[in-house]
Amino acid sequence: MQLSLTQARTWKGLLLLVSCMILWISVTPTPYDQMSNEELYDNLLSCSHRTHVVARKMYKILDLNVAERRCFKNKRNNTCHTTSTHTAKTNEDLLKVIISVSNAWIYPLKMLIPAVLTHLGSYDGMMARAIELNYGNQKILEGAKFLLSRIQPGIEENDYPVWSSLKELRSSNKSIHLFAFCKFFYCLRKDTKKIKDYLQILRPNIIKNKW
């Protein structure tokens, strides 16, 4: 039986997802409780840098190859769901913002994978990058939580903002879902940069063992 283009794309995406999951399971990371603060920080910074690079690449691919520069033209109209996140004033605040922003992307990044499979799966590497972003954001969230628990044990988790227009990613209307993807990757690129920058600000205190 010959598969349709949509079915073939779906199977390709599922096989890629399974392959990535097997790869992650086969790699046994060092538990956070066995890392020094500096080692944990280096792990977080490396992960945040990679995540930002991938988010920036996906935005560029979408804008140039799919949306015909509509992402760039409409970027000033984008309001991100994390805009209301509080400004950080202390080292602890920096970590709390990182945790809040990462938390705010957990569900959207899970929803991104099937949306990319449906609408952008034919573009080389987009599916793999969507999976990598989902995994990278989870690792940043886990690591930041663990680091904060060392300096403020028993701290309660703050509320995080929710994206209300995720359903537009699944729209069958091309204009609607392309605009939603543009906004999604614009905001993700912006937030992954914020996380990376905040982690870099923390570096002096980590290196000087102030924690």
Curated annotation (Swiss-Prot):
GO cellular component, one term: extracellular space
UniProt xrefs under InterPro entries: 4_helix_cytokine-like_core, Somatotropin/Prolactin
Disulfide bonds: 80-187
Record GO terms (molecular function): hormone activity; prolactin receptor binding
Free-text tissue specificity from the UniProt record: Expressed exclusively in decidual tissue.
Pfam families per UniProt: Hormone_1
Biological process per Gene Ontology, one example term: positive regulation of receptor signaling pathway via JAK-STAT
Subcellular location: Secreted
Record keywords, A-Z: Disulfide bond, Glycoprotein, Hormone, Secreted, Signal
CDD domains associated with the record: prolactin_like
Protein known as: Prolactin-3C1
Record organism: Rattus norvegicus (Rat)
